[in-house]
């Protein structure tokens, strides 16, 4: 398998950031699992997509995460019934990270490889990179895609969230703080070679 090269731009000089009044669902674990149960009862398996957005700071890869107090998550969300995964991820990233009114057709996201699939066997917090042998009807399937950015773009997130860049060495093997999915990212993207560019 050939090694792919990704071009990363500087977090501090390439991008601008703002906050807006955006309608965000309650982020508590209890409310999230309640929504999952309601969705499962109506539609069956919940299908979700999330983006591993990679940038650099001082020549080291960082991942963009949304933070709500001490809760961290990758940007993304639930697919609509029958929605294509790439289209759905672009829609969710645009809704959560772009200024209000940005057409999906103008979205800056460059969706790359699907690098991981995670399964939620029950209405509980735990996710696994496989379906446990005793589970016949998992409740959620979450797919992670690598996302890169052009040299310039503008972010705008909900007032109650922060968009932060976290280094790979902070994330790696740190499931206690970031959870199993996010802490696995350094291994998932180790197959890539990165080129670091700085734009004034």
Curated annotation (Swiss-Prot):
The record marks 24 as: Interaction with RNA. A motif (Nudix box) lies at residues 77-98. PROSITE patterns: NUDIX. It is found in: Nucleus; Cytoplasm. GO terms for molecular function: mRNA 3'-UTR AU-rich region binding; mRNA binding. Gene3D superfamilies: Nucleoside Triphosphate Pyrophosphohydrolase (3.90.79.10). Residues 70-72 are annotated as: Interaction with RNA. GO terms for cellular component: cytoplasm; mRNA cleavage factor complex; nucleus. Residues 45-170 form the Nudix hydrolase domain. One of its GO terms (biological process) is cell differentiation. Signal peptide: none annotated. InterPro entries: Cleav_polyA_spec_factor_su5, NUDIX_hydrolase-like_dom_sf, NUDIX_hydrolase_dom. Pfam families: NUDIX_2. CDD domains: NUDIX_Cfim25_Nudt21. Keywords: Cytoplasm, Differentiation, mRNA processing, Nucleus, RNA-binding. The keyword Transport does not apply. Component of the cleavage factor Im (CFIm) complex that functions as an activator of the pre-mRNA 3'-end cleavage and polyadenylation processing required for the maturation of pre-mRNA into functional mRNAs. CFIm contributes to the recruitment of multiprotein complexes on specific sequences on the pre-mRNA 3'-end, so called cleavage and polyadenylation signals (pA signals). Most pre-mRNAs contain multiple pA signals, resulting in alternative cleavage and polyadenylation (APA) producing mRNAs with variable 3'-end formation. Homodimer (via N- and C-terminus); binds RNA as homodimer. Component of the cleavage factor Im (CFIm) complex. Belongs to the Nudix hydrolase family. CPSF5 subfamily. This is Cleavage and polyadenylation specificity factor subunit 5. It comes from Dictyostelium discoideum (Social amoeba).
């Amino acid at each position: 398998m050939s090694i792919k090269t990704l071009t990363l731009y500087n977090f501090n000089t390439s991008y601008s950031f703002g906050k807006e009044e955006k309608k965000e669902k309650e982020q508590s674990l209890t409310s999230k699992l309640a929504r999952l149960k309601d969705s499962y009862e109506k539609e069956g398996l919940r299908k979700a997509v999330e983006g591993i957005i990679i940038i650099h700071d001082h020549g080291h890869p960082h991942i963009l995460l949304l933070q709500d107090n001490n809760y961290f998550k990758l940007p993304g969300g639930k697919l609509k019934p029958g929605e294509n995964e790439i289209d759905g991820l672009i829609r969710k990233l645009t809704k959560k990270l772009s200024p209000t009114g940005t057409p999906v057709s103008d979205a800056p996201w460059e969706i790359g490889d699907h690098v991981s699939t995670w399964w939620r066997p029950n209405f509980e917090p735990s996710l696994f990179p496989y379906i446990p042998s005793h589970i016949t009807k998992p409740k959620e399937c979450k797919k992670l895609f690598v996302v890169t950015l052009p040299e310039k773009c503008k972010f705008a997130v909900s007032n109650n969230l922060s968009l932060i860049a976290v280094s790979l060495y902070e994330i790696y093997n740190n499931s206690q703080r970031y959870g199993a999915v996010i802490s696995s990212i350094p291994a998932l993207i180790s197959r890539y070679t990165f080129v670091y560019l700085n734009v004034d």
